[in-house]
Amino acid sequence: GRADEVLAWQIRTALAGQDASRAGAVVYAYEPRWAIGTAEAASPDYVAERHGRIRALIGRDWGAPAADAARVIYGGSVNPDNGPALIALADVDGLFIGRAAWTAAGFFTLVRIVAQARLAARGAVAA
């Protein structure tokens, strides 16, 4: 629907005139408009669908290698409760964090929890 149209327009506008190597070198940060400035978090299913769509749009216009190389990160009420599930998603390459990292303790707690979840999702063991 409309969200897909807006995503396509934003990506095409930002990358107008760029070649595939440049499109693949960009870090794409996604946050649902309705989540900006709120404590309302998107479900992991919603985030997976949106990030998959972003990657598909990049692939359609700049090719699969650009889509695979692109880094797509998520923000939108990321916190210690939902961060592990979000970072474990296949198309989520990282997180950008707001109020959950306003303090050093909050930031380090989230980094530790998310790093452990990322390692577990990849089959590695956290130290």
Predicted regions and their residues:
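Catalytic cores of alpha/beta
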Residues: V78-D91
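Hydrophobic residues within beta-strands of alpha/beta enzymes
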Residues: Y28, D93-L95
